[in-house]
């Protein structure tokens, strides 16, 4: 199967990933310029397996059956894996994206395989990207919405996990409590992919990393500034900063900082420069990416008005992007409330890459599933 893939990618090359061998956390004096894409050959795929819309919570406990950093059964958090594995998955995402963009439809590694998609929280992007991606690679995905499955209420999570494992080859779940995804993975005998929890959103950040590589040329050594609530998106950026060295800044109002334990863990990894600040104007200077998310996530709508008041001064507008500098891109995990956390002008500006970013959800997730299923 991998050999067939290698023959396909020879006619559909994509940007190569750039990760320097330096272990330094920051690269002063390095100027990264904005460009639309890098046209360099990528390595053939290896033969062996390899918010948005959620509120922030405290760090959850870890699953009890953690294996090696490269051969984990599940994809629950980016920093569960080592740097080499994350690089391999991103390489794979780039290759498979190029293959699909070329019109090639004969690479079907998921043929005969099925996936259950559990949605305690609805999401257009998560459902369409997973379902379409799995289909394009030959598989069949089943949607299980809130009315179809209620883990921990109508049926215990451990029972759901063991039943679905007997029907499916892989499970994706988008849930509220992070403990739900940990329990699902612990009792499932097939791989489980974290489609989002209140604690983190690893698939989104993998897509974001792929998007940065395509437009900037690399993740390593860049400056990413997140402006807004220190929520699950920030937690997953911190996960990425634990395995790839770059400069990450979270600019948020006082009282809305990310989980302290999560921040501490990322700093202890010793790879990236990490800052938490309450001054967005100072934070964005020299940024390669300015990133935003909704101020009131799903399950927080009763706090929306209070949050709007608390987040005054944290809107990403044209003036803030000007402070960031000419090389800065704007990214947003979507859905966006235009006129609230970001202006319409910023979303529609030439430096906005929110829609390539949204597309890359599918390609990053395809690569994650290929890795977990041994392709």
UniProtKB/Swiss-Prot annotation:
Keywords: Acetylation, Amino-acid biosynthesis, Arginine biosynthesis, Chloroplast, Plastid, Transferase, Transit peptide. Its EC number is 2.1.3.3. Carbamoyl phosphate binds at residues 123-126, 174, 201, 204, 333-334, 361. It comes from the Eukaryota. SUPFAM superfamilies: Aspartate/ornithine carbamoyltransferase. It catalyses: carbamoyl phosphate + L-ornithine = L-citrulline + phosphate + H(+). Its main location: plastid. The keyword Plastid applies. L-ornithine binds at residues 232, 293, 297-298. Residues 1-53 form a transit peptide. One of its GO terms (biological process) is L-arginine biosynthetic process. GO terms for cellular component: chloroplast; chloroplast stroma. NCBIfam families: orni_carb_tr, PRK00779.1. This is Ornithine transcarbamylase, chloroplastic. It comes from Arabidopsis thaliana (Mouse-ear cress). The lineage of its organism: Eukaryota, Viridiplantae, Streptophyta, Embryophyta, Tracheophyta.
